Amino acid sequence: MEYRRLGHTDIDVSAICLGTMTWGQQNTEAEGPEQMDYAVEMGINFFDTAEMYAVPPMAETQGKTEKIIGTWFQKKNNRQDIILATKVAGRAPMDWLRDDGSGTEQTPAQIHEAVDKSLKRLQTDYIDLYQLHWPDRPIRIFGGLGHKEMGGEINKIEDILGALADIQKAGKVRHFGLSNETPWGIMKFLHHAEMDKDLPRMVSVQNAYNLLNRIYELGSSEIFHREGVGLLAYSPLAQGYLTGKYQGGAMPQGSRKQLFDRLQRYEVDGAEEVIDSYLDIAKKYELDASQLANQFVTTRDFVTSNIIGATSMDQLKLAVTSIDVELTEEILADIDKVHLRAPNLCP
């Protein structure tokens, strides 16, 4: 396993991060520990979760993922060996996360409540990386183009950072990161931390990045090189579409598409043809399509860690061992030809 520095911290994280969002929904409470055991055996020291998980978000399963991880920590007595990342929800009408029944947003009070609940579920007294799951301001996230307004007062970035500073001073969190964030948002958070040294500096951003969505390269990748804010890339397989399992209208039993029908981000016009082209590249070079897609993400120089997810051990093993796949200049050139023909179809 390869290890990379997390932003301007003294922490080295594995180039592959274990994603967990299906635990407690598609994956049972027994399957989560099996995945963690295998990940550690393969050298992975970085786990990512969120207060909202399992996915899709609902009151019945909220918090289950963190609880599975916390139980594993207590059984293994190895908390110190894992770099643990979790997230506080952004603005949404999810009225089951907060004690007062309000929807989620990133007020100081909600941030304090959220981190304390995560610590309890995770059975730990500190979190290594605490991330803002999505911005608390008008912005289009989780797919689509254009600007999207949302109602209500917007919590000021400096107030959010002030709350984060408080929980850091209390020893509850070591470092902070962003998620589903824009170049403007990343730089505003960095600017406030630069102007007020008492505010924490963001060390990472967790955004979608894959062969169908390379939007990150257009603005945010420069921030990595100039500011040291690393990308934690999620959805490297485009929610499974880059494996080819949904091609031609296929609907595998037990898949996320079959169970929840919420993957429309990767069903835009032209996407199936582009996916076919990437599948052809994998076939041409005798590679597994999922490993091609994963290793493309892992090997980008602005990626700190590739967040993989799996609902079976076979999927997990393919994802983890993708780090051993060599992508030659010829393979990368073929990938870029497809990308330039139809760039960023699924932002």
Where are these regions (language model features)?
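An active-site-proximal structural segment forming one wall of the substrate-binding cleft
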Residues: 107-126
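Active-site mouth loops of central-metabolism enzymes
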Residues: 20-30, 97-109, 147-155
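Aromatic/hydrophobic pocket-lining residues that form the small-molecule binding cavity
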Residues: 32, 65, 111, 115, ...
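N-terminal binding-site loop/beta-alpha segment at the start of enzyme catalytic domains
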Residues: 1-88, 112, 125, 169
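Residues at the N-termini of beta-strands
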Residues: 15, 46, 126-129, 175, ...
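Surface-exposed, active-site-proximal loop segments in enzymatic domains
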Residues: 56-63, 92-105, 138-146
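Beta/alpha (TIM)-barrel catalytic core signal, keyed to glycine-rich beta->alpha loops juxtaposed to Asp/Glu
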Residues: 135-337
